[in-house]
A protein has these predicted regions:
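Surface-exposed binding/hinge segments that line
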Residues: 61, 75-138
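Structural recognition of the beta-strand scaffold that forms the well-ordered cores
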Residues: 39-42, 112, 173, 192-195, ...
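Gly/Pro-rich hinge or "lid" segments in bacterial periplasmic/extracellular proteins
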Residues: 116-186, 190
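N-terminal lobe/hinge region of extracytoplasmic solute-binding protein
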Residues: 1-34, 155
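Ligand-site clamp/hinge motif
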Residues: 178-222
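Extracytoplasmic/secreted proteins, especially bacterial periplasmic and envelope-associated proteins
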Residues: 8, 17, 21, 25, ...
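Sec-exported extracytoplasmic/periplasmic mature domains
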Residues: 14-18, 45-48, 65-73, 119-121, ...
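Aromatic- and charge-enriched surface segment that lines or borders ligand/interaction sites
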Residues: 28-79, 113, 205
């Protein structure tokens, strides 16, 4: 799905591997306080954006505070953010508190500290979802309302960059990101995704060898 496409381009602190296990993404290491309410994450020294600049703790702080103050319909992501129980989140989203009071702090370029209202045993699981990816503030400011509308208006920090995407078209092409921190272990140089709205046609394309992978609906699995 499109969520998987996004995760290939934008990596967060943690990722889920092919076996469904949580692995470190842009997080090199972390500590948790005895009361399980304070997490300290250390960003990889070699984590980079696709323009070659470092991914920093400030990029995560900016993105997460932006999530709490964003306007518009983000209902599909809201539950993922609310369940994290970050300190003062409700007060910030309601306007009772400023975004600076959210429990997310970039201690330095490579250290992100997060305070929770109460222990959340699945907190690291939540951090594998899309809303927790970093955003480079200077790029967003530069692009303004054009941020994200085409492949060149975004910086990528995942294994792939968006190489081709035509709005309204049916093909998405991803290219290996040479600036990705683990690029040497990315074996596939290009991924071509074809949008086929009819599931039967998609299955036929798979059977004919036109595509390598297809998503099935529940009634087609036996």
């Amino acid at each position: 799905g499109l969520g998987d496409v996004y995760k290939r381009q934008m990596e967060g602190l943690f990722v889920v591997d092919v076996d469904g296990q949580i692995q470190n993404g842009l997080c090199d290491s972390y500590e948790v306080s005895d009361d399980q309410k304070t997490y300290t994450f250390h960003i990889r020294d070699n984590a980079k954006w696709s323009d070659g600049t470092p991914v920093t703790a400030q990029d995560f702080e900016y993105a997460w505070k932006r999530n709490a103050t964003a306007q518009g319909d983000y209902s599909k992501f809201t539950y993922q953010i609310e369940m994290a129980a970050i300190k003062n989140y409700e007060a910030v989203t309601s306007g009772e508190a400023d975004a600076d009071e959210l429990g997310v702090t970039a201690v330095d370029d490579n250290t992100l500290q997060v305070e929770l209202e109460y222990p959340v045993p699945f907190f690291l699981n939540l951090l594998t979802f899309s809303p927790w990816a970093p955003v480079k503030e200077s790029k967003l400011t530069e692009e303004g309302d054009q941020f994200g509308v085409d492949k060149d208006s975004v910086l990528y920090c995942g294994a792939y960059t968006l190489d081709q995407w035509d709005v309204g078209g049916n093909t998405i092409v991803l290219k290996k990101n040479p600036d990705y921190w683990d690029a040497e272990n990315v074996d596939v140089d290009e991924i071509d995704l074809v949008v086929i709205s009819d599931t039967q046609q998609a299955v036929m394309a798979y059977q004919n060898g036109d595509v390598d992978n297809v998503t099935l609906t529940g009634d087609m699995v036996s």
